[in-house]
Amino acid sequence: DHGPSQDLEHKVFDANLHPHGILELTTTHEYRMAHAVINLLGNLEAGGAPDRLMALRILRDEVLHSARTPFRYNTGRVLIQIMKEIIRSRQDELTQLKLVHDFRKVTSGNPRLVRQFLNTYHLLEMPEEWNQLTVDHHVHDANTKGRKNATHLIMDAWIKGIRYITVVYYNYVEPAAARELLQAAEIMGVDVRIGLEFRTPFRDRFVCFVWAPRGFSDPEAFLSFLAERPMVALMNEGRKASLWMQRHVMDTLQLWNAKHAPALAEELEIPVPFLEPEAFLAYVGTGQTSFLHLAEYAHKTLLKHLVQRVKALQEEALTATSERQS
């Protein structure tokens, strides 16, 4: 398991200390890399944006600057992926021990071993010059309908070998969210663009389009652009549009409770729980409420009842007459 780092560990793993400096006197290279990944994953869940960015910078330094292999980029990608699997397996000690053994082997940077684990985790080998043309031009973070904050999103893009990415926000983007995304991308060497998705009436229906401003030299230039008066006015209008959409989604939730849930319960002969608005908003978290969130939440609350109903029907089928089975 992992949690907040201790004060002593914060001092030892100071981002201002170079991996080839005094850190080499404190502990082993493997331990520092493992700690860097755990520190980042812990901050992804509980830390603020500055903590996440600091943890990402420390991880980048440990993975790339202290690597003792010419295969450092691919080695780093595999190591982070293995550590993510270790965290996910926290309830299975045997699996964790096997993964720790794999982590220890990969830290050697042996190209044959690294390629083996790239294949295991379905990751493509990338050139060590890091000049591949890999793109993903429409992804979302936790500020819209995604589940990953900006730092987590960039880290996963780097693991997959993506160098060019467009992160799309609905109607507006908060400067703090843009700052974290741009700084995380700068740390990991990912070329990121921010897109704004708008919906507009067209021939009696809505169409969506994405506007991705370009031509900025660094993150501060884009943030200055967001602070300009016309952009501030546009973002305020975007917030109003998002509030309208939230009300529309919540009205649909009430319609589900009043009409569709009882009808589905009668048809499927299972209890269909009502959706609590407060619980639904807590499920959405920092994102913007959407019909995708509502569909996922309704499915989540309904799934266990569907599974129980299927099991009951399977048990009944074992003893039922042929007429009943048909």
Where do the PLM segments sit?
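Hydrophobic, aliphatic-enriched repeat segments that assemble into extended interaction scaffolds
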Residues: 186, 191-213, 242-260, 289-291
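Non-catalytic, alpha-helical, charged scaffold/linker segments
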Residues: 3-6, 15, 20, 24, ...
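An N-terminally biased module of ancient metal coordination in phosphate/nucleic-acid-related enzymes
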Residues: 1-206, 213-219, 224-226, 326
